[in-house]
Amino acid sequence: MTHSLAIVERLPGHTEVMGGFAALARELGWDVHLLFNRSDSFQFVDYLAARLGIGGDRIHDWSYINDHEGEFDAILLNTSCVWLEYGGRLQQWASSRRLMVVHHLPEDIELNPHGASLYLTPAVDPGKWIFPLYGSPGLPESLCENPHFSQHQGGVGHPELPGLVTIGALDLKDVGGVSAYLKAGGRVVHYDRHRCHFFPEERDYSQHVGLGGAEFMQSLAGQQPIFLWFPIVPESHYMVYRFSGALIMGVDLNCVMVMPEQFRQLYGFPEDAVISYQSSVMETECLGKLRDSPAKQLERRKRLAAWAGERWEKNLGIFRGLLGLR
């Protein structure tokens, strides 16, 4: 008999994370239903359904759980805020079936002690965090002969800086670093839900606004080579508890990821799998790594793919335990 899992997202946003749990459940032989807020025009659910082979009859509005909770063997609440909508029903779900709740802060458990907790960063509990992946990763067959790196990047010591891609609002991020990179002759391609007004006069800055999941992934995949930058400042919540969905795309598309060293250490990316810097992307060592040869960038991507494979197996072990499987 096939078991069924409902993954519920009440709020607009966060739907890209749902794919990580759905992929694990599918791998373990579970039937998966995705429940989300249909007012979210930027949702990833349609993309995930096509990517993971989830039929349209298993895609619902978030409120579907209110009348159909008995149909599921397990319920996963995709963000810690969601449980506020359900009140006392959480205790019922926890006692009658396996309830899982994605928490972000340690205090969330005190507010909602029902169900099994899991996390999207290892900051709270390294043994209970899952890095969302859309399947068992593998290195693209064409990677070794990818012409884009030699076409656009240049060789060792080439003065040209690669274009950097960044995803999400730049408010509360390193806007100064973005500006400095542009002034140094680099290009920045920015994806966000809303129009950014920080760089109206910069000709080497471009933005893609308001793309839905499938359109977004198609556009992002076309930005070859993909140097994906996380311009996060030291005091940001992203450095501890808050998960950046852009990380999923960085690993899934096997990008060369560029990030603060503190961020690399948080997620345990190997030093040779990403390009990291202490406080600024403009540090001499970081700029040198950005100008590395295509062969060196290929080594980083291979190492990242290996890390993702290891992480997928760890994810499976954690999720299997949460579902009560041996």
Regions found by a protein language model. Give the residues of each.
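Nucleotide-activated donor-dependent transferases that construct or modify glycoconjugates
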Residues: 1-12, 228-234
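Short acidic alpha-helix that forms the nucleotide-activated donor recognition element
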Residues: 67-70, 212-225, 252
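Conserved catalytic-core segment of nucleotide-activated headgroup transferases in glycan assembly
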Residues: 136-218
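A charged, aromatic-enriched C-terminal amphipathic alpha-helix characteristic of glycosyltransferases
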Residues: 153, 277-326
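Extended catalytic core of nucleotide-activated donor transferases of GT-like folds
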Residues: 4-6, 19, 23, 33-126
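Helix-loop-beta element that forms the nucleotide-linked donor phosphate-binding surface
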Residues: 112-117, 124-147
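A short, glycine/small-residue-rich beta-strand->loop->alpha-helix junction that serves as a flexible
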Residues: 7-21, 172-173
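Nucleotide-sugar-dependent
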Residues: 227-248, 252, 260-262, 266-268
